[in-house]
Amino acid sequence: MVRPPDSVKSHSGPNHPACIDPELLLKDCQIQHVRRSGPGGQHRNKVETGVVIKHLPTNITAEASEKRQQGRNRSMALFRLRVNLAIDHRTTVDPENPSLLWQRRLSNGTLKVNSEHDDFPALLTEAIDAITHFQFDIKQSSQYLKCSSSQLLKFLKKEPRAFTLLNQKRSEAGLHPLR
């Protein structure tokens, strides 16, 4: 069972699908069970343990087939879907303050979260939404999020696709890429 993230009630963009309870998110999703190659030897593909989840309102998908148990693959696919939604779907930010989740995870200007924790997609959403809101200005975004620029970049680098997206958007805006 996937534990709902602490962000359910506290994200600055509460309508973002990566920030709602995973079970509620699944109500807007189509789940498909598929056969994929993976661990388990010659009898592995006799059952459909792979899972593909598609978020219907945004058409964003994620899949998992590494494990031999369909339930574990479902949990992994759901987490990946939330990360994909965090990267590819934007909402507006609360102009006043970062979310309570962000504030709880911040300790002396350092954001403490593992990239595999259930809160990670919601925090990633908030960081990317803030950066987008401040037109890809890392300094302004980090001031809003109450952390240093280097901490914000370090957090984004935990998901390389998010960091690549940031540099792509900065380039489109005529700004230099970040390292």
Feature locations, PLM:
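Helix-turn-helix DNA-binding helix
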Residues: 151-153
